Amino acid sequence: MTNIRKTHPLAKIVNNSFIDLPAPSNISAWWNFGSLLGVCLILQILTGLFLAMHYTSDTATAFSSVTHICRDVNYGWIIRYMHANGASMFFICLFLHVGRGLYYGSYVFMETWNIGIVLLFATMATAFMGYVLPWGQMSFWGATVITNLLSAIPYIGTDLVEWIWGGFSVDKATLTRFFAFHFILPFIIAALAMVHLLFLHETGSNNPSGITSDSDKIPFHPYYTIKDILGALLLLLILMSLVLFSPDLLGDPDNYTPANPLNTPPHIKPEWYFLFAYAILRSIPNKLGGVLALVFSILILAFIPLLHTSKQRSMMFRPLSQCLFWLLVADLLTLTWIGGQPVEHPFIIIGQVASILYFTILLILMPTVSVIENNLLKW
């Protein structure tokens, strides 16, 4: 008799995705982040569900309801901090996952890569709306500043902003709809993640060498299941260390002050994972230009496969491209630092240089250096 996992319509899908899936024998720990993102998403949906049971999306009671969760609900404090810091872990895994894709040329799988970009945008939108929900000072002013950017769109901008707000300012209607969207989006992300996997399994995984691994495959289970479980345990160890020892390390103290439309905080800034994009936005003196740069700072990823001029897929054997890649990482860290600094000398000029360098590396230097490497190898 054939095993049920190979015949049952549902079990068969699970079997072909997580058990009998042929996987390259040499994929490193950098390939763990996909499963870690899945763990993060499940964790966020579960903690978010329990938070939603006690949260009220009304301007008069939102802040108090979060306080109530932390003080009065059984283990509410740990659920709240796991959700808040879980978002940080989510973005750390996201950035490392995208970085891995850039380094090893995973973007050659166009469909998988493009769905990944959509996933990145959806996750950023979800995180932004979630940050508004506690209705602290930074929640309110962050929502005001970021939604206001849409007013830079010619002709329809102002109407669009007021339509999103549900009025003439960020208010009760805005908070209610943000809660609704924040609740539904993670399920859309989960569906997109399945499509992401579907496209990946059409081609099979890439590997560090960038060379086809069809001649050397191993079953996903037990080799990569145990590896993924180890990764998940390490992720939980880091997350719980953060939650239990310094839960407010990555948060903004301003968000412990209830939202006040009459009092603007001295430095409005988003959560740390958006600071690099925020720095690029602020580097351009023109509003529309800044918004376009902000969008393209992420959308530029869609152009990476088109700019791949190297005859090798991975950067594993391309030392010049490796240097540029790590320069890009350093540049993004610089932008993250600048995004959290006030708009004054010398931070303005550092931000502008770092922003120009970011686009220059991706659009000009990397394709050029790839051609040079091809010629050095007499290809």
UniProtKB/Swiss-Prot annotation:
Details of cofactor binding: Binds 2 heme b groups non-covalently.
Entry binding sites for heme b b566: H97, H196
Main location, first listed in the record: mitochondrion
A Pfam cross-reference name: Cytochrom_B_C
Membrane protein topology class: Multi-pass membrane protein
UniProt: heme b b562 binding residues: H83, H182
Cofactor: heme b
InterPro entries tied to this protein: Cyt_b/b6_C, Cyt_b/b6_C_sf, Cyt_b/b6_N, Cytb/b6-like_sf, Cytochrome_b, Cytochrome_b_C_euk/bac, Cytochrome_b_N_euk/bac, Di-haem_cyt_TM
Miscellaneous: Heme 1 (or BL or b562) is low-potential and absorbs at about 562 nm, and heme 2 (or BH or b566) is high-potential and absorbs at about 566 nm.
Subunit structure: The cytochrome bc1 complex contains 11 subunits: 3 respiratory subunits (MT-CYB, CYC1 and UQCRFS1), 2 core proteins (UQCRC1 and UQCRC2) and 6 low-molecular weight proteins (UQCRH/QCR6, UQCRB/QCR7, UQCRQ/QCR8, UQCR10/QCR9, UQCR11/QCR10 and a cleavage product of UQCRFS1). This cytochrome bc1 complex then forms a dimer.
Family to which the UniProt record says this protein belongs: Belongs to the cytochrome b family.
Name this polypeptide is given: Cytochrome b
Native source organism of the sequence: Canis lupus
